[in-house]
Amino acid sequence: MPEKEKDPQDPLREILAMLEREIAERPPTIGVVGVSGVGKSSTINSLFRTSLATSGTVARTKEFEDVDLSVRFNAPLAADSSEKSSGPGESPVAPQTNAPTRVLLRVVDAPGLGEDLALDDRYLEQYLENLPRCDVVLWVMSARNRAIALDQMYLQKLSRFYDKIVFGINQVDLVEPMDWHTGYNIPSREQEANIKAISQDRLEHLASAIGRKPALLYYSSRYGYRLEHLFKALLDACPENRRWIYAGLKNFSHLDFIPAETQQKLVFRATRRLAQMLSKSDHR
């Protein structure tokens, strides 16, 4: 009896199953930290369409809280063995189109530092205990608060995590003269100039504190402004030995969390298109 021909997709399925097992055992994990009142939980809610408790008057997060999300993952698969192998001096054969699946993305919401001196030691212990399991850490700051001495002080105590920190300046919609263009979801010219001045000032102070130029982005969790830039910066900051996991998330953005019916609305499409045009002009 002739031997049954093997399905060429079997090895690919095995690879995909192996990737899924690895991710299930140690899911990609993003920590969100910072001093109290800067909008950490609201940032998570805006980025990932969650519903963590938030408050503008009292601190809500008292312990590290894991938020588990199911997201699309494009697993990189090897090139089809039937294709011609590349010879000496030739470019390597391009991999097959990625195979989409669903995986767990873990977001860790941290209690705010600086809320109460009596709590700081306990919170710092929690930071030291939980941050090692995070692949990348978003350190949230507020655009409204020019004083960053607290951030600098806590950063000194968490120096072992510098390599995995991305700094985010939240609440830019509240920067003077507070004339945000809600119809287009962009700041006014004067407001944008002030936002960029604040960002440059923070960049210089943070570079002085950690001894290197940090990854820093400004955004508004309230309006969802520049969240896609923020999310991609987090993916880019992942550790090298975990990069293969985050490479599968590269084609995924915060827009994937927005319901399809919302994305089809004319105002939403127009706003997104305008944001893309402005983003391109910023990089010219």
Label each residue range with its predicted role:
Residues 1-110:
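Conserved G1/Walker A P-loop phosphate-binding module
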Residues 79-137, 141-157:
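Switch II of P-loop NTPase G domains
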Residues 52, 115-116, 148, 176-177, ...:
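Conserved protein kinase catalytic core
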Residues 219-222, 231-243, 249-284:
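P-loop NTP-binding site
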Residues 173-248:
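Canonical P-loop GTPase G-domain recognition
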